[in-house]
Every structure is written in structure tokens, then in C-alpha cells.
């Protein structure tokens, strides 16, 4: 949460924050164009993301699609102005390169029957975000109206591109 406040100049009250065992996520929307995502594994910043960040993004999209079933919504509509961060704890993480910029691990622990990082993150994000959107109409409306407005703006500007 503090990271998003400092790096994206977001208002502390607008940052949504979930914390669980071995995982913490925070996100908000800003007036900036594009997407800002930060990811961490065991306290190390993974600048190039990895399996945990992809699972975070994918589960976020899945939840939004559950609430806006329209086929006219694109990922870019969901993530324009999005600022988010994910931090997970993985036993014996494997990184793609020596600098630890990207997580390459696929499971949470080294045990053969360990849950995959993808399943762990997707389950956490979907459960927490769905609950929030069902229970808090202000947050639900803020997010969904923004996404719909961005999709409509994109469609309105499309003839200008052709």
C-alpha cells in the first residue's frame, strides 16, 4: 500500500489492500495512462514480473469479466490507469536470471504436491476481489464504471484511427 502511495501518488483512501498468508496485494486507479505493476518475491522486487504477476493480472481480468460480461471490454480497458502490487512468499524461489528480476518458480514449495503459484494467486485474488465487489457497491461502481467508460471512449475514438 505504501509503495503505491509513493510511486503512483495515489490517495491512501483509494488503495485497495488484501493480505493473506504468504501473499499481499494492493491496487488502485490513477489519472495516468497505461499500467503500473510492481511485484515482489520474498522481499525481492521482480521488475520483470513472473508467474505471480501474470496470475494477478489474469485473475483480476477474470473477476471484472464476471461483473461485466460484455465482449466489448478489453484488458487495456481494465488496466488503463491501474497501479498494482503483489508480494508473495515462496519456499526456495527460482528466478529466470541471476539478477532476480523475474520469478520462474511454478509452485509455492519444493514438495511434489505443492499448490501452483498460479492457482494460489488466482484463488486468493478471485476470492478477495469478488467478495469486495459484491459487498461494497461504492468500490464496485468505481471500478466497473471506469472500465466501461474507457471501453466506450476507445470505441468512440476507433473511427478516427481508420
Regions found by a protein language model. Give the residues of each.
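GHKL-family ATPase ATP-binding module
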Residues: 1-162
